[in-house]
Swiss-Prot record:
Involved in storage lipid mobilization during the growth of higher plant seedling. GO terms for cellular component: glyoxysome. It is found in: Glyoxysome. This is Isocitrate lyase. Pathway: Carbohydrate metabolism; glyoxylate cycle; (S)-malate from isocitrate: step 1/2. One of its GO terms (biological process) is tricarboxylic acid cycle. It comes from Helianthus annuus. Its EC number is 4.1.3.1.
Length: 58
């Protein structure tokens, strides 16, 4: 079996070619919204941000 490589070759590349939004799951999951809420509540600083340096969708 080729596992993840087979998924990338057969599914994910086609999704990327067609601009499928779910490839960037943090964009459609609301991560940016919740980060803004956390920053507002915590006075602009948070250590639990879902988006930012080091995330898979930089």
């Amino acid at each position: 079996t080729r596992g993840m490589l087979a998924y990338v070759e057969k599914i994910q590349r086609e999704e990327r070619k067609h601009g499928v939004d779910t490839l960037a799951h943090q964009k459609w999951s609301g991560a940016n919204y919740y980060d803004r809420v956390l920053r507002t509540v915590q006075g602009g600083m948070t250590s639990t941000a879902a988006m930012g340096k080091g995330v898979t969708e930089e």
